[in-house]
Design a protein with these regions (language model features):
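Phosphopantetheine-dependent thiolation modules in NRPS/PKS and related acyl-activating systems
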Residues: 2-37, 46, 51-87
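Two-component histidine kinase catalytic core, primarily the HATPase_c
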Residues: 41
Length: 87
């Protein structure tokens, strides 16, 4: 999956879960600082991302997913690993 598609899916999830405008969901946006997510919002976002992309995001990884771009990069990396393992 291309990063553009990953971004679009992440953006849709963030817009739905946080109730914000799509324009606010930029690669450099911080979930907490810029988008106003609290700890419960973050948990809901993680669960939605795991279900949407069929991946598991470890507790350790969640602490590193500070911005939209961090999240896109992490998901893209996980999807590439899954594709490699399937071959």
């Amino acid at each position: 999956m291309k990063k553009v598609k990953v971004f679009e899916k992440v953006q849709n999830i963030v817009v739905e879960k946080l109730g914000i405008e799509p324009e606010k969901v930029t690669p450099i946006a911080s979930f907490t600082r810029d988008l106003g997510a609290d700890s419960l919002d973050t948990l809901e976002l993680i669960v939605a991302l795991e279900e949407t992309f069929n991946i598991e995001i470890s507790n350790q990884a969640t602490t590193k997913l500070v911005t939209i771009q961090h999240t896109i990069d992490y998901i893209s990396q996980q999807l590439e690993v899954d594709v490699e393992l399937a071959n």
